UniProtKB/Swiss-Prot annotation:
The keyword Repeat does not apply. InterPro entries: QueA (IPR003699), QueA_dom1 (IPR042118), QueA_dom2 (IPR042119), QueA_sf (IPR036100). Its main location: cytoplasm. The lineage of its organism: Bacteria, Pseudomonadati, Pseudomonadota, Gammaproteobacteria, Pseudomonadales. It catalyses: 7-aminomethyl-7-carbaguanosine(34) in tRNA + S-adenosyl-L-methionine = epoxyqueuosine(34) in tRNA + adenine + L-methionine + 2 H(+). Transfers and isomerizes the ribose moiety from AdoMet to the 7-aminomethyl group of 7-deazaguanine (preQ1-tRNA) to give epoxyqueuosine (oQ-tRNA). This is S-adenosylmethionine:tRNA ribosyltransferase-isomerase. One of its GO terms (cellular component) is cytoplasm. NCBIfam families: PRK00147.1, queA. It comes from Pseudomonas fluorescens (strain Pf0-1).
């Protein structure tokens, strides 16, 4: 399978650079996995597609203000994007500067604070901070908006680039399908008899990295930490028992559930995953998906194509572009039911 199969034309004007006034004010494109039928709706219409007894699985990771600005002791400016917090004083981070800092060199953080470059691990730098990392980030860090938003973060992003149910600190990118849900909608979902469960996957900056190979099969996914608890396993089993559907909110919830069911049976799991879901890979847990619109040639678009079928997904994206849907993190959403016999690009030529 070629990465180029997953490209599409996207006008720059359709990239959402700010959130709408209301979280649930987005549009919703629905895709029926059996018939391939599309429907243009509002996000609040999602309730009409839910059934009593369904289970919605959310990712409760919380985005940390992971971007720091500073300078080396020599005076050169640099930018730090924390990828993973290792302990109270150490992180793994991406560092952008004219020259990479060397082990032992000091970094002065804008707003107050100091770090030391401890070691380099391939593309990542291990940094040690004089004070505790999380309070420092909360005090002087910036929200790590994706590169395609291409604007400085604003005070409102601390709230809006965060789900209302965010709980466990550790992500450097939001699980964006969840940004559409406000407390009122969450209560309406519960009132309809739909159960909820929460996994944790700390989204890393690697989610924005382009696929740099020509053949999908040659791509190696970045790793991210996740946790699927016994409570989630029990909730999925109870959902199956009553004939409900497991509805993943976001691709990170899909990757969490499917990582914990690699042998076909869902089990509690805590640790790193590098699961790469693309056309041809079976799904063991998820029956329906709420997701945003993703970048061309991205692993997330490949995941959606594996779930809904390649021709159906690309047709849906063309319809979204033609109808002026807003794309990416602050954009609109899709509700997709799983295609029981999804085709890949090579089967549609």
């Amino acid at each position: 399978m070629r990465v180029a199969d997953f490209t599409f034309e996207l006008p720059d004007s359709l990239i959402a650079r700010h959130p709408l006034a209301e979280r649930r004010g987005s549009r919703l494109l629905t895709l029926d996995g059996v018939s391939g039928a599309l429907a243009h709706r509002q996000f609040t219409d999602l309730l009409e597609h839910l059934r009593p007894g369904d289970l919605m699985v959310f990712n409760n990771t919380r985005v940390i203000p992971a971007r720091l600005f500073g300078q080396k002791a020599s005076g050169g400016k640099l930018e730090i994007l924390v990828e993973r917090v290792l302990d109270t004083h150490r992180v793994l981070a991406h560092v952008r500067s004219s020259k990479s800092p060397k082990p032992g060199s000091k970094i002065l953080i804008d707003g107050g604070g100091e770090a030391e470059m401890l070691a380099r691990h391939d593309a990542l730098f291990e940094l040690g901070f004089a004070e505790e990392v999380l309070p420092l980030l909360d005090r002087v860090g910036h929200m790590p908006l994706p590169p395609y938003i291409d604007r400085p973060d604003e005070g409102s992003d601390r709230e809006r680039y965060q789900t209302v149910y965010a709980e466990k600190l550790g992500a450097v990118a939001a699980p964006t399908a969840g940004l559409h849900f406000d407390q009122t909608l969450m209560e309406a979902i519960s009132a309809k008899g739909v159960e909820t469960a929460f996994v944790t996957l700390h989204v890393g900056a690697g989610t924005f990295q382009p696929v740099r190979v020509e053949k999908i099969e040659d791509h190696h996914m970045h790793t991210e930490w996740l946790e699927v608890g016994q409570d989630v396993v029990d909730a999925v089993a109870a959902c199956r028992e009553r004939g409900g559907r497991v509805i993943a909110v976001g691709t990170t919830s899909v990757r969490s559930l499917e990582s914990a069911a690699r042998d076909g049976v869902l089990k509690p799991f805590s640790g790193d995953t590098d699961i790469f879901i693309y056309p041809g890979r079976p799904f063991h847990v998820v029956d329906a998906l709420v997701t945003n619109f993703h970048l061309p040639e991205s692993t997330l678009l490949m995941l959606v194509s594996a779930f809904a079928g390649y021709p159906e997904t690309m047709a849906a994206y063309k319809a979204a572009v033609d109808n002026g849907y807003r794309f990416f993190s602050y954009g609109d959403a899709m509700f997709i039911t799983r295609n029981p016999a999804p085709r890949g690009p090579e089967e549609t030529v």
